[in-house]
Amino acid sequence: MQFHSSSALVTPFKKDLSVDEAVYEALIKRQILQGMDACVPVGTTGESATLTHKEHMHCIEIAIETCKNTKTPSNSRMKVLAGVGSNATSESLSLAKFAQKVGADAILCVSPYYNRPTQQGLFEHYKTIAQSVEIPVMLYDVPSRTGVSIEVPTALKLFREVPNIKAIKEASGSLKRVAELHCYEKDFHIFSGEDSLNHSIMFSGGKGVVSVTGNLMPNLISQMVNCALKHEYQQALEIQDKLFSLHQALFVETNPIPIKMAMHLAGLIENPSYRLPLVAPSKETIKLLEKTLQQYEVIA
């Protein structure tokens, strides 16, 4: 993968629950200007499960066009890791082909949820999607949401047998699993998919992060990753410790409920709107978010 720090973008909605394209573009530009290497549209945090196929594709297009038209501080272009996950292989395949056609740099594909395929089913699912495109593919293991895990032998087999499967987003919560993957395949790039473990995964062989907190604090997430890549353990740990209470607050309810409310409180999105079955956070969660953002001087 040609990037290391990335944010799993929220999808802002208007009051009528249509996608707020202007705010979405502004959020991506903010990521670019604050030093992130890549953005990840329409993943879990982007509420992809409740977007229509047309909306999903359009969000990918917006991300790609915004990144093409906005230079980073180093005068380069931020990469787009397009989410193409679905519990139907045919739909993921269609989204993958579309993402490649419109210029995505790579695709992120989650394991099918609800279906609970066998390991052979997971292998065939990912292989079929990856072989339909030429751009790099990042597997996404998040068993708490999908009900099934990509077991280490399956992940390694995919990496070894499918040339454009290059990376895996690890949200299993298991550092033992991260260590095992890195032990057997040093070139299989591991990305943290769990903000509270960013530092631990980076110093267990990780190559980057796909961060939820990065929506709010892209500069600090980028700094932490860059320090880790330079083997500056203590500096990276200081940033991780600084962000830890924010990481915790953003996951007190189902993601992306807290992060969208936090971004609203911070003035980054106008409407903290959600599509059912997701609903607004509790009053207790809002108070916690307000207190946490005050501690970080994000709000007064």
Swiss-Prot record:
Subcellular location: Cytoplasm
UniProt-recorded Gene Ontology molecular function terms: 4-hydroxy-tetrahydrodipicolinate synthase activity
Top-level division of the source organism's lineage: Bacteria
Entry keyword set: Amino-acid biosynthesis, Cytoplasm, Diaminopimelate biosynthesis, Lyase, Lysine biosynthesis, Schiff base
Enzyme class of the recorded protein, top EC level: lyase
GO biological process: diaminopimelate biosynthetic process; lysine biosynthetic process via diaminopimelate
Gene Ontology CC: one annotated term: cytosol
Record's keyword annotation contains Cytoplasm: yes
Segments crossing the lipid bilayer: none
Xref: Pfam families: DHDPS (PF00701)
E.C. numbers: 4.3.3.7
Biological pathway: Amino-acid biosynthesis; L-lysine biosynthesis via DAP pathway; (S)-tetrahydrodipicolinate from L-aspartate: step 3/4
Catalytic residue list: Y140 (proton donor/acceptor), K169 (schiff-base intermediate with substrate)
Gene3D superfamilies, alphabetized: Aldolase class I
Function: Catalyzes the condensation of (S)-aspartate-beta-semialdehyde [(S)-ASA] and pyruvate to 4-hydroxy-tetrahydrodipicolinate (HTPA).
Homology family: Belongs to the DapA family.
Subunit structure: Homotetramer; dimer of dimers.
Protein name: 4-hydroxy-tetrahydrodipicolinate synthase
Origin species: Helicobacter acinonychis (strain Sheeba)
Gene that encodes the chain: dapA
